[in-house]
Structures are given as C-alpha cells and as structure tokens.
Amino acid sequence: MQSWASAPVPELDGGGPQLRLYDTADRQVRPVTTGPTATMYVCGITPYDATHLGHAATYLTFDLIYRQWLDAGLDVHYVQNVTDIDDPLFERADRDGIDWRELGDRETELFRGDMTALRVLPPREYVRATESIACIIELVEKMLASGAAYVVDDPEYPDVYFRVDATEQFGYESGYDIETMSRLFAERGGDPGRPGKANELDALLWRAARPGEPSWEASFGPGRPGWHVECSAIVLRELGAGIDIQGGGSDLIFPHHEYSAAHAEAVTAQRRFARHYVHAGMIGWDGHKMSKSRGNLVKVSGLTAQGVDPAAVRLGLLAGHYRADRSWSDAVLADAQGRLARWRHAVALSAAPSARDVVARVRRYLADDLDTPNALAALDNWVTDALAYGGHDAAAGAQVRDAVDALLGVQL
C-alpha cells in the first residue's frame, strides 16, 4: 500500500551523540546500537475513526527517532502496518452500514493526510494486514508444525492458538506478573475463558470462519488472523529476525508486543525479537486517556479544520516527554502557538546569536532518550536572547531553522 509523501529533511553539519532510549524490556535507558541500516517497526492504526492526538503523539515519537538516525548518517528501514482486520473495524462498519473495506480505506486516507500535515516521515513499507494474509498463514503453519500452536477441540469453530509456554522467555518484554497479564489479557482483546484452551493466556492466532465475518482459506481451515500474529508476520517478511526497535503506545506493551515478539521468537529461536522495545505515553483530555472507545478525542483533522497550524500541534505534543502520560488542553495549544510565533520571529532576524551551541544542545538532549522538554527549552533561551539583544551572525537564523526542521520536524 502507498505510504504518504515525505517532507524534505535538511542536512546539518556535524553530528550528535549516540542515541540512547529507554528499553521497556530492560527497564533502563541504554544506547541504541544498529548496523549501517537501522530497522524499526511501529504498530499502526486500526482504521475505524480519525487520527486523534494520542495516535499523533505516538507517531511523532518514532518520527523523532527516525530523524536522529538520519542525522547520524544511517539508512533507515522503517515499516508500519495498518490493522485492517479487527473487531472494532467490523463493528463500526456494521453500526454505520458501510462495507468494512470502504471504512478502512477512508480512515487510512485520512490518517495519511494527518501524517503529512504533521510532517511525520513516512515508513518505507506501509502494509495492510489484508495484504499480508499469505505470510500470516505461513507463520501459523510453522507454529503448528513446531508445536508452538494448536487447534482447539471444537468441531464448529476450530480456532488456532499460540502456546504461551512455547518460549522460555515469555513475559520478559513487559515484566508483568501473571496476575497483571491475566487482567490485561482479558481487558485488551484476549479470551481467557475460551473452552478448549490449554492455558488461559494462550493467544488467538487464527479465528475460524464465522457467519458474517470476512475469511480467507488456509491449510488449517478458513478464517481470519488474530491481532498479534499480523505484526509478527509482517516484521519477519519485511525486516527479518532481530530488529532494532519495535515501537508503539504504552497500551501495546501487553498483550500485543509481548505476544508478537513471542510468536516470532517461537519460529526463529531468537532470544529477543527486538533489541529495543520503545513505548510512548498516553495523551489525556480532562483527566482520562484519549481513546475512541471513550469518545473524548481531539482529532488532528479537527484542529487543522479550525485553522490551527499543524506545526503548533506538533510543538504542543513535543512539549512533554514522550514516555510520560500527559494531558492536552487549550492552554497547551496556546503555549505551543506562542512558542511557534516567537521562534519564527527569531529565525527571521537579519542577525542573531551563533547557532552552534544551541544546535549542539538540542542534539545532546534528543540523544538522551528524546528529551524534548529540555531541547525546546534550549531553543527558547536562544530565541529570548535573539529577540532581546540580536546578534552578529547573519547565518544563525537559517541554521537554527534547519536544525529545528531536521531534528524536531517543525517548519519555521
């Protein structure tokens, strides 16, 4: 499937320190070590509604990582999926009296437009689950052949499940205890009470065909894939075993990322599906997580339709640290709009203070677990000096403008 158009990224002189990120599995900030080509997979949207600021904050996080890698001179192989086979999509389509494929196409196109507006760099491969059925079936066949999966004893609906004990290391990614896993599994799409399962935490790989649901033919019977195996199969096909970063929102730590890692590890015998597991915090409104199910969404398209500059939306989301759960508000947006106006005024000056030190500080802060609050504060200090005292460097404004564009994705 076609991705969206890429915004140009200015090339900067020099470089910054090695990128260090918090790894969910290791529970610490540590260096991100890659080869000449850095590999990253980020879980994409389920396209049944418009992009809200919680989505945007997640994809901005991995856009920052992409930009730090480009600044370091790396090639980046970035893959993102679209979960266009999932119950929420089918339920929304049924509610609205629309074909689920048409709904998915419409919302995916809106998402692409939102990402373009926010100047999020596109993935090299942007992959629908429906485009990946063959590789999903192949992966399930491998798990069945190895004993990592089984078919439940149900003549009517012989679903295929993953054995949670198929790998010795299951649970390392989240670090959760069994009680927490069981609770989250039930809350986030699992089916612990399904009769015939060997373990209540065994995850669905293939849902046998039901009346009124889309299905595809497979050697183990017609049906459709489970959620987690879609991502496992796409990663193995597009990037191979052992990627540098698997990413998404913190609500994907368990069960989704734990299981997608375990599925791949069960057939590759690798100890770690990804060298870094990176998760972005949740965005709230009025004290609650912003979510489609709660209905408290602030949508990117809604803000831009009101005339809000997408650069201000981006700055507002970058004002908080990516791992922190944080709230969006009218005050956050107003602060971002004021900051954007000051920055644009400063870089347009005919002369300003030297850009060298502030660019170095921004690089250093971003390399330290994407510390955007301090990076933005460093730029604020330069802007304050430029507006108050001017300077003697005629090239400084353009240099800061290019650095803000290249490293933060904000166009001044």
UniProtKB/Swiss-Prot annotation:
Cellular component terms per the entry's GO annotation: cytosol
Annotated motif 'ERGGDP' region, positions: 187-192
A Pfam short name: tRNA-synt_1e
Binding site for Zn(2+): 43, 231, 256
Cofactor: record remark: Binds 1 zinc ion per subunit.
Reactions catalysed, as given in the entry: 1D-myo-inositol 2-amino-2-deoxy-alpha-D-glucopyranoside + L-cysteine + ATP = 1D-myo-inositol 2-(L-cysteinylamino)-2-deoxy-alpha-D-glucopyranoside + AMP + diphosphate + H(+)
Short sequence motif named 'HIGH' region, residue ranges: 45-55
UniProtKB keywords: ATP-binding, Ligase, Metal-binding, Nucleotide-binding, Zinc
Renumbered ranges of motif 'KMSKS' region: 289-293
Residue stretches spanning the membrane: none
Enzyme Commission number(s) of this protein: 6.3.1.13
Cofactor(s), names only, from the UniProt record: Zn(2+)
Single GO BP term: mycothiol biosynthetic process
Sample GO molecular function, one term: cysteine-glucosaminylinositol ligase activity
UniProt-listed InterPro entries: Cys-tRNA/MSH_ligase, Mycothiol_ligase_MshC, Rossmann-like_a/b/a_fold, tRNA-synt_1_cat_dom
Gene3D superfamilies linked to this entry: Anticodon-binding domain of a subclass of class I aminoacyl-tRNA synthetases, HUPs
Residues engaged in binding L-cysteinyl-5'-AMP: 43-46, 58, 81-83, 227, 249-251, 283
UniProt-listed PANTHER family: CYSTEINE--TRNA LIGASE, CYTOPLASMIC, CYSTEINYL-TRNA SYNTHETASE
Stored NCBIfam families: mycothiol_MshC (TIGR03447)
Subunit structure: Monomer.
Similarity comment text for this entry: Belongs to the class-I aminoacyl-tRNA synthetase family. MshC subfamily.
Function: Catalyzes the ATP-dependent condensation of GlcN-Ins and L-cysteine to form L-Cys-GlcN-Ins.
Protein name per its UniProtKB record: L-cysteine:1D-myo-inositol 2-amino-2-deoxy-alpha-D-glucopyranoside ligase
Species whose genome carries this gene: Mycobacteroides abscessus (strain ATCC 19977 / DSM 44196 / CCUG 20993 / CIP 104536 / JCM 13569 / NCTC 13031 / TMC 1543 / L948) (Mycobacterium abscessus)
Gene name, Swiss-Prot/TrEMBL: mshC
